[in-house]
């Protein structure tokens, strides 16, 4: 193709993504667009086509990114090249959304005609505005009995400040309004900027591991062009590779001779190691590099740490490989080896949040067939010892002896909670219950309020999101930055089963709530741990002091069943004999702890009601 032809082709490209709150119909709309543009034959069509992971279909959420090329013949007779980049909608995956938005010029904002604007919609719209995208509002599910498109239209204008007078009224399920959306993309989404003659600059927005071709990068070409045979350089680490193949997804991978400015596609270059490719990195040509990398990409810091252990310790190396492969597609997953007396060899992993943790756990179990145990999540504490030493501890079992601890600092976050006015009371009550300190409150408009609190990160990782969403009917949007470390009265609580410490059940708690939380966990474990042949005491202890105890009663055979009447001393003899047997069993017996016991330390629902 000549430079002139490439420039004309660039004018016809439209890169866009779909942003929406969970369940507002994003994946269904993507399916309809694929059908309307005849990208996928009706024989191959299936619901949530872009959500290729079983897990995504089951949970009805989008986790990974997918980028697809479609051809659309517009009413003006011209054929346009659309690149649809699918985005996740959950708060844990905000970074994935920001990556995919950086590869677009426009975004379709899908809002449910019955539910209206929700928290995550807002968060994603702000990300789109940060990337200077043209936003096309679409009011979806207009065929629902509870739909109120006019109210939602006003809401979009008042809350987000977008002109919604031309918002398309659609129903992705019934296929209403799809053509209008496609026409609006042609008219309103700008063609990609960028110079096809400039040095290559391409943004990596996702990567997938392929056993035969190595790491496959999903890229958006910002300037220049790339073709097989080129020598590319990754700008973050200076490593060079030879391009073996480039192409696009339709959703299947299709080879191409080149990818030019504005294109979204994949690139394979025999990249062997997972760690070389950083999502958000810039690809350029080794012999004619770009002057500066693309900006706006940050290293992700994990919020939540938890131990992951294979139930079968011989699977340790398989688990390491599995985590390395997951890390390739998920720049936000961190892990390092660790050992536990109770659980053996495993890994300490860092996650973005609790949904992220859940998803990784399920993917390890499903895709790699590894049965595993996961411990309760925690954050990184600074522990100052009486010798003047500072330790960084993210695992409660590594906490030093309480007598040697001088002080403990924990991370606080500056939490910005945007919420409709009627829920301000509920948000303030929740934040205070979670040991938050009020900072300030601003009114954004007549209805929305921005509340700022300083809250310990440890309180947020438990169930702050869920509590916030339920106490505000899902309207609160929440964003946080780690602000500082502060001294806190924290203690390490150990759980003892049958007199033995279970290191994987230890956790850190504020002194004020230690008694209640200890009591709650002991009661929970009593319900979860199966009864044994002998009595099992469960104790919660701080140092040497036992703060709560509960006993699991022994299973016992009725040894008196064959004594019909008869002498009481005969019965007593049988009972004494049974008692001696149980005592002997107790001294040598060990207690199996089921996976739910580790997770029960997680969900502190009841203890929130008590606080």
Curated annotation (Swiss-Prot):
Where does this one sit in the cell? Cell membrane
The protein's predominant localisation is membrane
**Gene Ontology CC terms:** plasma membrane
**Record field: catalytic activity:** GTP + H2O = GDP + phosphate + H(+)
Recorded hits in InterPro entries, A to Z, give: EF-4, EFG_II, EFG_III/V, EFG_V-like, EFTu-like_2, G_TR_CS, LepA_C_sf, LepA_CTD
Q: Name one Pfam family in it.
A: EFG_III
Q: Does the keyword Membrane apply?
A: yes
Family matches, as PROSITE patterns? G_TR_1, G_TR_2
Q: Where does GTP bind?
A: 23-28, 140-143
Q: Which CDD domains match?
A: EF4_II, EF4_III, LepA, lepA_C
* UniProt KW keywords: Cell membrane, GTP-binding, Hydrolase, Membrane, Nucleotide-binding, Protein biosynthesis
Q: Which GO terms describe its molecular function?
A: GTP binding; GTPase activity; ribosome binding; translation elongation factor activity
Q: What class of enzyme is it?
A: hydrolase
Domain tr-type G: start-end pairs: 11-193
Q: What is one GO biological process annotated to this record? A: positive regulation of translation
Q: What are the EC numbers?
A: 3.6.5.n1
Q: How does it sit in the membrane?
A: Peripheral membrane protein
Q: What does this protein do?
A: Required for accurate and efficient protein synthesis under certain stress conditions. May act as a fidelity factor of the translation reaction, by catalyzing a one-codon backward translocation of tRNAs on improperly translocated ribosomes. Back-translocation proceeds from a post-translocation (POST) complex to a pre-translocation (PRE) complex, thus giving elongation factor G a second chance to translocate the tRNAs correctly. Binds to ribosomes in a GTP-dependent manner.
Write out the similarity annotation: Belongs to the TRAFAC class translation factor GTPase superfamily. Classic translation factor GTPase family. LepA subfamily.
Mind telling me which NCBIfam families this protein's record contains? lepA, small_GTP
What's the name of the protein?
A: Elongation factor 4
The gene designation is lepA
């Amino acid at each position: 193709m000549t430079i002139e032809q490439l420039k004309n082709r660039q004018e016809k490209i439209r890169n866009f993504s779909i942003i929406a709150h969970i369940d507002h119909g994003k994946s269904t709309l993507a399916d309809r667009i694929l059908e309307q543009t005849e990208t996928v034959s009706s024989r191959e069509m299936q619901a949530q086509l872009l959500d290729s992971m079983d897990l995504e279909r089951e949970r009805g959420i989008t986790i990974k990114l997918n980028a697809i090329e479609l051809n659309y013949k517009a009413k003006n007779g011209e054929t346009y090249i659309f690149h649809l980049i699918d985005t996740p909608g959950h708060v844990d995956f905000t970074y994935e959304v920001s990556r995919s938005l950086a590869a677009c010029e426009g975004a379709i904002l899908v809002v449910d005609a019955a539910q209206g604007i929700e928290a995550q919609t807002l968060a994603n719209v702000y990300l789109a505005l940060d990337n200077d995208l043209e936003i096309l509002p679409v009011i979806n599910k207009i065929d629902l009995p509870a739909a109120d498109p006019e109210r939602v239209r006003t809401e979009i204008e008042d809350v987000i400040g977008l002109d919604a007078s031309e918002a398309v009224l659609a129903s992705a399920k019934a296929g209403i309004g799809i053509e209008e959306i496609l026409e609006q993309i042609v008219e309103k989404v700008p063609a990609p900027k960028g110079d096809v003659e400039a040095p290559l600059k391409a943004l990596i927005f996702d990567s997938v591991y392929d056993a035969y071709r190595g790491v496959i990068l999903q890229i958006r070409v910002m300037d220049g062009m790339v073709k097989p045979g080129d020598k590319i350089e990754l700008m973050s680490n200076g490593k060079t590779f030879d391009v073996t193949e480039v192409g696009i997804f339709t959703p299947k991978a299709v080879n191409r001779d080149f990818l030019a400015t504005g294109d979204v596609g994949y690139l394979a270059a025999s990249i062997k190691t997972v760690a070389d490719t950083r999502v958000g990195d810039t690809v350029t040509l080794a012999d004619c590099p770009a002057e500066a990398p693309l900006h706006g990409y940050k290293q992700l810091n994990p919020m939540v740490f938890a131990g992951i252990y294979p139930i079968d310790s011989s699977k340790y190396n398989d688990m390491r490989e599995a985590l390395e492969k997951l890390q390739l597609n998920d720049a936000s997953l961190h892990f390092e080896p660790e050992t536990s007396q109770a659980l053996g060899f495993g890994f300490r992993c860092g996650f973005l949040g609790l949904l992220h943790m859940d998803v990784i756990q399920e993917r390890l179990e499903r895709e790699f067939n590894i049965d595993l145990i996961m411990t309760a999540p925690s954050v990184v504490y600074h522990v100052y010892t009486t010798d003047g030493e500072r330790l960084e501890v993210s695992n409660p079992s590594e906490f030093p002896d309480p007598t040697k601890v001088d002080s403990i600092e924990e991370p606080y976050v500056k939490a910005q909670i945007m919420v409709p006015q009627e829920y301000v009371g509920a948000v303030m009550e929740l934040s205070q219950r979670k040991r938050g300190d009020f900072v300030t409150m601003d009114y954004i408009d007549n209805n929305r309020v921005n509340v700022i609190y300083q809250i310990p990160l440890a309180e947020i990782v438990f169930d702050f999101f869920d509590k916030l969403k339920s106490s505000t009917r899902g309207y609160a949007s929440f964003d946080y930055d780690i602000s500082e470390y502060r001294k806190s009265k924290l203690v390490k609580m150990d759980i003892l089963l049958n007199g033995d410490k279970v290191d994987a059940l230890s956790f850190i708690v504020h002194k004020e709530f230690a008694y209640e939380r200890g009591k709650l966990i002991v009661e929970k474990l009593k319900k979860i741990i199966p009864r044994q042949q002998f009595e099992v005491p469960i104790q919660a202890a701080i140092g040497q002091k036992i703060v709560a105890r509960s006993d699991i009663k022994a299973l016992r055979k009725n040894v008196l069943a064959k004594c019909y009447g008869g002498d009481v001393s005969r019965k007593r003899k049988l009972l004494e004999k049974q008692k001696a047997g149980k005592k002997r069993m107790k001294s040598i017996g060990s207690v199996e702890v089921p996976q739910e016991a580790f997770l029960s330390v997680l969900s502190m629902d009841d203890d929130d009601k008590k606080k």
